[in-house]
Amino acid sequence: MAELKGNKYGTHRVIEPKGVLTQAAWKIDNDMSKVYSNEIVCDVTSLNIDSASFTQISEACGGDEKKIGEMILGIVAERGKQQNPVTGSGGMFKGVVAHIGEDLKNKPGFDLKEGDKIVSLVSLSMTLSLIHISEPTRLDVI
């Protein structure tokens, strides 16, 4: 996988408005055909939408699970990340590390490896997302 050199704060992914960090950005570039040397690519197995965001989405969709899923996919398609435009909040994800950029692999003390399971403690509101559903999914409300 060819890697590009990115800004250490991730601003190379910001589309709109320019000059802000990814969490403050309205839209970020989630084009995964471009991978930067300071990024970690994960295959996501589970999205956990935060409570405020999920409640707002659920109410807007009348509790219809299909519509909820479509709305989440729409947010990610429009914004490049899961950041609810009404609440400003995101959530977190669970997944598996698929690729680690060279700048990170070479950092002293960095011990993450491809294939490791991972839980993101960084909000989805600042994490670029590209959702491609390759198998049936379900909506668990807990």
Q: Which residues does each predicted region cover?
A:
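Conserved protein kinase catalytic core
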Residues: A52, K105, V141
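Short, Lys/Arg- and Gly-enriched loop/turn segments at beta-strand edges
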Residues: S53, S125-H132
